[in-house]
Structures are given as C-alpha cells and as structure tokens.
Amino acid sequence: MKISPLGAVIAADILDVDLAKPLDDQTIALIGDAWNDQLVLRFRNQRLNDDDLLRFSRYFGELDPPGPNPYGVTFLPEYPEINVISNVRDDAGVPIGNLGDGEAVWHADMTYIDN
C-alpha cells in the first residue's frame, strides 16, 4: 500500500490496496494514521459491494444509522447503516435514494460527538 499526499495541506491518495478484501491490522492502522494526518483520503478503482463497504467502514468504529428521510423508508432494508444518496427515480417515479434534489450541500456530520 502506498500513501501519496495530494497537496501541502490536506488529502492523499491511498494506492495499491483492495478494500473489497479483509485488511490486516497494520494496513488498517496505516489508513487510520493517514486519515488523521491528511483528513481526506481518496481510494481509486475500488469495486465494493455493500458488505465490503460495511466491513471497511467498521474498521474505524461503530456506524451511526442514517437519519430519517422525507420518504419514510429504508432504502436498503438489509443494510440499514447505508444511506443511499441518489437523484434517480424508478419507473413509477419513486426515488431510489435520498437527498437527490441538491439538499446535501457541504456539511460535516456528527461534529457534536467527541469521538
């Protein structure tokens, strides 16, 4: 695995790691350190299914469920921790996701939590 900073201030590319596979403790620690140092990490060319995404996310702590949405549905009932953000509608005109009308402007979630 290679960590390549993208600038002098924040952000790095994480290269040569397959997030679809389980990671060892050393790799998880290196990614965590890079996240603390760089604040924004970019992982290119990843092919993750929902299980892969949840496994990788859980390496860094307990997941908070998405908040309520205006449609009152869980978009992925088998994966309630995943919030689908999409502006796509199905054939009946029902949104397949949340926040599809530009509601997700830049913001920071959970800033009121210590850790």
Please give the residue ranges for each predicted region:
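Fe(II)/2-oxoglutarate oxygenase catalytic core
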Residues: K2-V40, R44-N115
